[in-house]
């Protein structure tokens, strides 16, 4: 697996990337990137080109990072889904590239105050908890984002859920439950990481 070159990579470091085939036969590329530029970046999009063993392009896909913007030094997971199942067996390699726009810094005023996780008897994996808005402004469209890892610390899943309530006034509390519903991968989960995002704030 290789990572493409280009101007956009001057703004990011790819911390990891991994390919997974889901229970329906679709290829997912999971990964994490860090903003190494000197400014906040928004609308960060991961682009992938897919190749067969002969180096021929068999398709492309893209996906927006889970965080709506990345402060300087901040890390976000991403997911790209290749929807052409007819090419799954031909897949051999891929390249990654990233595009972004200049954004505005988000304070880290969303705090995870409780957290627990568990698998269920049906093969799903749940991550739930509570969030506090420690900022002075209302946080809108609050989202909990969970990245899942296997025994080898490879990223094997990414899922998110809107908090309840999704708009949090100053110093209020919301709850969330994120579900990992790919049963093939959920049985391999060894660890996870969690981020909270909103239009105004991010988590610590």
Show the residue positions of the predicted features:
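Proline/serine/threonine-rich low-complexity linkers at boundaries of modular beta-sandwich domains
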Residues: 2-11, 101-108
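Short, solvent-exposed loop/turn segments enriched in Ser/Thr/Gly
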Residues: 24-30, 121-128
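Asparagine-centered strand-capping/turn motif at beta-strand->loop junctions
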Residues: 33-38, 131-135
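Short acidic/proline- and small/hydrophobic-mixed sequence motifs that coincide with surface turns
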Residues: 40-43, 58, 91, 138-141, ...
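Hydrophobic beta-strand segments
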Residues: 45-48, 63, 143-146, 161
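Short aromatic-acidic-glycine turn motif
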Residues: 50-59, 148-158
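Intrinsically disordered, low-complexity Pro/Gly/Ser/Thr-rich segments with frequent PxxP/GP/PP motifs
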Residues: 58-86, 157-185
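Terminal connector regions
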Residues: 83-124, 181-204
């Amino acid at each position: 697996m290789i990572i493409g070159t280009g101007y956009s990579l001057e703004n990011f470091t790819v911390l990891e990337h991994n390919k997974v085939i889901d229970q329906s036969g679709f290829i997912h590329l999971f990964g994490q990137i860090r903003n190494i530029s000197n400014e906040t970046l928004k609308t960060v999009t991961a682009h992938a080109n897919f190749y067969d063993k002969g180096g021929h392009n068999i398709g492309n896909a893209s996906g927006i990072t889970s965080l709506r913007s990345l402060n300087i030094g901040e890390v976000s997971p991403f997911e790209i889904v290749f929807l052409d199942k007819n090419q799954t067996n031909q897949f051999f390699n891929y390249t990654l590239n990233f595009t972004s726009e200049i954004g505005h810094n988000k304070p880290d005023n969303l705090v995870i105050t409780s957290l627990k996780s568990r698998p269920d008897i049906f093969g799903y994996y749940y991550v739930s908890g509570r969030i506090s808005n420690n900022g002075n402004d209302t946080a809108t469209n609050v989202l909990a984002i969970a990245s899942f890892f296997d025994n080898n610390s490879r990223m094997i899943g990414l899922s998110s859920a809107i908090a309840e309530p999704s708009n949090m006034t100053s110093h209020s509390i919301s709850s969330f439950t994120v579900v990992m519903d790919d049963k093939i991968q959920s049985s391999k989960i060894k660890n996870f990481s969690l981020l909270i995002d909103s239009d105004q704030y991010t988590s610590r």
